[in-house]
Amino acid sequence: PYDGSVDAARTALVCIDWQVDFCGPGGYVDRMGYDIGLTRAGLPATARMLEHARATGMLVIHTREGHSPDLSDLPANKRWRSARIGAEIGSAGPAGRILVRGEPGWQIVPEVAPVPGEVLLDKPGKGALYATNLDLVLRTNGITHLVLTGITTDVCVHTTMR
């Protein structure tokens, strides 16, 4: 919670991993057998926040978690964990290879897709600051405040916040 005023010029909206693999039919989460209605629940609020951010000139940043097609940036323990739950990263699924850059499941869902001029960062890990230029983008744009939204709150959003 923040009790002060928000200066749009110094605030960025960071939309974390709203990807088909996490909240779309045939994606990674759907393939694991989870109810994607739960992962999609935050989309309407995020769409409204995006509309507000765009209208006020706030910097909008989107992230996508994914790995190179040859999986050379996929740590062994991450691959092992995904295989244990039956949806190994890189394996074929209804939305293409799971969490692989360039595949349909890696794309951001249409409801909150980036528009031209918005920052789009690709990351191989959970946090948006790991192996990306997010810090540089924030500093270059004079950003002092962040509004975070995304999927999965307990993993990627929380890791970015920390």
Language-model segments: residues:
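Positions that flank functional sites
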Residues: S68, A128, T153
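Active-site-adjacent alpha-helix immediately C-terminal to a catalytic or transition-state-stabilizing loop
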Residues: T140, M161-R162
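Short beta-strand immediately N-terminal to the catalytic nucleophile in serine-hydrolase-like folds
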Residues: T149
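Internal catalytic-core helix/loop-beta-alpha segment
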Residues: R97-L146
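Active-site acidic carboxylates
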Residues: P1-V115
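Short glycine/serine/threonine-rich phosphate/pyrophosphate-binding segments
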Residues: T153-T160
